[in-house]
Amino acid sequence: MSRRAIALLSAAAFLVVPLLPIVPEFWVALLDYIGIAALVAIGLVLLTGVGGMTSFGQAAFVGFGAYTSGVLTTHYGVSPWLALPAAMAVTGVAALILGAITVRLSGHYLPLGTIAWGISAFYVFGNLAIMGGHDGITNIPPLSLGGFKLIGVRPYWVVVWIAVTLAVIAALNLLDSRLGRAIRALRQGAVAAESFGVEIARTKLIVFVFAAILAGLAGWLYAHFQRSLGAGAFGVSAGIGYLLMAVVGGAGQVFGALLGAGLVTILRDVLQDWLPRLFGASGNYEDLAFGILLIAILQGAREGLWPLVARLLPAQRSRAVDEAAPAMPGPPSTRPDGPLLALDGVRKRFGGLVAVNGVSFAVGSGEIVALIGPNGAGKSTLFNAVSGIAPADDGRVHFAGAPIERESPQHIARRGVARTFQHVKLIPELSVIENVALGAHLHGHAGLLAAMLRLDRAEERRIFATAAAQLKRVGLAGNMHRAAGQLALGQMRVVEIARALCLNPSLLLLDEPAAGLRHKEKQALAEVLRGLRAHGMSVLVVEHDMDFVMGLADRIVVLDFGEKIAEGAPATVRDDPAVIEAYLGGVA
């Protein structure tokens, strides 16, 4: 039986069985609460597990949705169904404002920021008179359909789990899209994502707001199920509980959110009843138990519990690739009259250290130029200056006649500059072809709504056809459906080249592409690069393998201590005394 069939049968049983009279209402009510919590956890899977942004304040967004609906329905007589879009809009606007500030933080400052506004929201909910102050809001009307009030746990069960089902589908569709791959790239760091055109701040804000809107929907459901609100349900401790659900279930797994929500909600109910009896005194002992549980899971199953469950299910089928689909168009071919890339007096400092000092050289159209030098010579720093990751402090960098030394990596990528990295930057859990498809990010246009509704399928077919063509070009078509993390280091470097080629660049920057490759693989790579040159693409390559460089490059530029000490044809550079002294240690 396929994984899809198992999922459909399980979902059908899950939706029908709780409606049977033989199932106690207590358990149905518990499942209602699990569904509400699962909505928040799904958002946290996208935000934290996939996007790498830890949030302890997600309960505040549940509160925004709940209190908006509570105030509108009790104070102004608005229908709960009309209050739903208002609740989601208020939550979305609040997330947009808070996210515009918060998502730009990095490291431990981001979770600290979420704690700060989580505490602030808690005090707002508990002190504003319109929200009932510390007494909260009571007598919130229940949902109704066609005059039938959804009072009781069984009717509400249907509403809650329809919402959860739609949220799961939307989240899965989002992750299987151009935008979803960009979100996954965030967790690996901004440097690689920026290099193939992902707008980091915008992408972070999109997933932040989407996760908040799911929490706002959960708040709306909670308000009309509980029918009373108090600020205590939306404090930082509740936010930590939601984060625990995502981590326990599997922080990067959508179905893990359901598993984590179920496990934590049931355990909380059981522990709140039994632990006070065990200790002979009342108290929040379940928090201690959850702390122990979290430590145990982080030690024994760092990816959460869902991957353990997934191993018992049939293997997921590989994504079908329509190689006949038309490839995505690249940027217009750039053939300037002068050099394609020109550096003039480029200088880069890090504090008192001058990493690159007044370097000048040019790369012509259809030319392979190698940049060599001992470790610490400034080669990768120069690459970062050209690609906009670490802009030059002084000097000029021109591409196709236009200055780019102050442009962002995204804008430089749009001009037709692609690069690889000294330290491989792939997403290990994604397949090879999905990693390569990231390189075509700039050529797609589908946004959040199109991704969730699967209106982007034609664009996706073209993106994956482009990725498949580039994998075939570099000789890795047979590995396209393997997880990138399963490849050898040398193969990973070639995958990075295929990803860069998906941009269809005019200039390709390669940082140590032959490292980790066997001799035959190096020969094959050299043939690929010669083929690119024959088609008019320019290549600037940093490499330590002198045999590889000497047999490939048209010209070689040599750096030492951040300064250019030689430039010329391979034979000329090889015999240069300064190069022999600096790069080869004086050995003739």
Regions found by a protein language model. Give the residues of each.
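The feature captures the beta-strand-to-loop junction immediately N-terminal to the Walker
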Residues: 372-374
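A short, surface-exposed alpha-helical micro-motif characterized by mixed small hydrophobic
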Residues: 549-551
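Catalytic Walker B motif of ABC-type/P-loop ATPase nucleotide-binding domains
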Residues: 508-512
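Helix-to-loop junction immediately C-terminal to a conserved catalytic motif
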Residues: 387
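Transmembrane alpha-helices and adjacent helix-loop boundaries
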Residues: 1-325
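Conserved ABC transporter NBD signature motif
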Residues: 395-404, 414-415
